[in-house]
Regions:
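N-terminal pre-catalytic "stem/leader" segment of glycosyltransferase-like enzymes
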Residues: 1-88, 127, 228
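Conserved catalytic-core segment of nucleotide-activated headgroup transferases in glycan assembly
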Residues: 35-61, 186-285
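Short N-terminal targeting/anchoring amphipathic segment
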Residues: 79-97, 111-115
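Membrane-proximal helix-turn-helix segments that form the acceptor-binding/catalytic region
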Residues: 82, 104-107, 135-163
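Acceptor-binding helix/loop patch of EC 2.4 sugar-transfer enzymes
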Residues: 114-150, 183, 188-203, 210-213
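Nucleotide-sugar-dependent
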Residues: 122, 228-231, 275-282, 287-312, ...
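A short, active-site helix/loop in glycosyltransferases that binds the activated sugar's phosphate group
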Residues: 156-184, 188-194, 256
Length: 341
């Protein structure tokens, strides 16, 4: 493990700006793009709207400005449609307000695109998604919720002129379902993450990447839905802990250990869910970042974000050979690919 003398930084959501500021940002330049998401969060909204707007606004030479808007801005949809030249709807479920927003842009002869980062728009995959997430398939309400959500997502997609997604595998699913033209814009880190990641990497480089003599394997879970993914790697973790007294495990987030890990409790640490900026500190403190995934069409649609967030702080990843992980990792060179066994 790396002993990083690096305090936790103060964090608050940088996207919580009043509408007046977001409109002013949109109006800064000649080419103006409005991103829409139902409500702000630190997952899809951050990657597919906030980060996109941030990088577009940083490119002075392109004369492009961008901002983001939400359902609670509904009273100003006409103003947004007047100002922006293009609308990007990010992973949003159909409702009369979203239909109205799209209609306003269409009535003004403006292009509308749909951006999605998961296979959550085609109900043919609902059972696969539910099973992969480990949800209770015996609950009728669960099926109502998931079929409704994915159907509404697909309906919003069908109202748009084109689509954007995170990788070629998901792009093919989008094109097959919608018949629309699909472009790939991969996920990437924002400036807040990169600034802290650079500092963490520099500290490790100054120490010549020498830790405290103990090797730590880290599993960083963004949500409880990764329970079955973690279950893939847990037996191997127990074997490694039994064979290597110098190895420790750190689990971050919502995952609960199985019984095989109980006898190693003294070498298994838990960390609560962290904001995405301070998470870079934890990522930088471990030698290896574990990225197990079940093998199916839903997980092949996942992006490589867990890989590059770890790489930015000089942490190697051990990943399942999913579509995107195979594309990002050259086995034995910039990480490792490992099948479940």
């Amino acid at each position: 493990m790396f002993s990083l003398h690096f305090p936790q930084v103060s964090y608050s959501d940088p996207w919580l700006q009043p509408l007046s500021e977001r409109l002013a940002t949109l109006n800064r330049r000649a080419v103006r793009i409005a991103y829409f998401y139902e409500e702000p969060n630190n997952s899809t909204f951050r990657y597919r709207a906030y980060n996109m707007a941030q990088v577009l606004n940083a490119q002075d030479a392109e004369n492009v400005s961008a901002s983001y808007f939400f359902l609670f801005d509904r009273d100003h949809f006409d103003e947004i449609a007047d100002c922006a030249q293009m609308l990007v709807i990010c992973r949003s479920r159909y409702c009369h307000e979203i239909n109205g927003l799209i209609t306003k842009f269409r009535a003004r002869g403006k292009r509308v695109l749909f951006d999605v980062d998961d296979l959550v728009f085609d109900t043919d995959y609902t059972h696969l998604v539910v099973a992969t997430l480990g949800l209770d398939v015996r609950q009728d309400r669960l099926w109502d919720d998931w079929f409704a959500m994915m159907s509404r997502m697909g309906q919003t997609l069908k109202l748009c002129d084109g689509a954007i997604t995170t990788n070629e595998f998901l792009a093919s699913k989008l094109a097959d379902f919608s018949g629309l033209s699909v472009s790939v814009v991969p996920n990437f880190m924002n400036q807040e993450q990169l600034s802290l990641a650079d500092r963490v990497y520099e500290l490790k480089a100054e120490a010549c990447f020498k830790g405290n003599g103990r090797k730590t394997l880290g599993y960083f879970s963004g949500s409880p839905s990764h329970r079955l993914d973690y279950a893939i790697v847990e037996p191997a973790l127990a074997d490694v802990l039994a064979q290597r007294p110098d190895v420790e495990v750190m689990v971050v987030g919502y995952i609960e250990h199985g019984p095989s890990m109980q006898k190693f409790a003294g070498r298994v640490s838990r960390q609560p869910f962290h904001d995405y900026v301070n998470l870079q500190r934890l990522l930088g403190s471990v030698e290896f970042n574990l990225m197990p995934l079940q093998s199916n069409a839903f997980t092949d649609c996942k992006s490589e974000l867990k890989y590059f967030e770890a790489a930015s702080v000089g942490t190697l990843s051990i990943a399942s050979p999913s579509f995107t992980y195979r594309g990002a990792i050259r086995d034995g060179e910039n990480g490792y690919l490992a099948k479940a066994h």
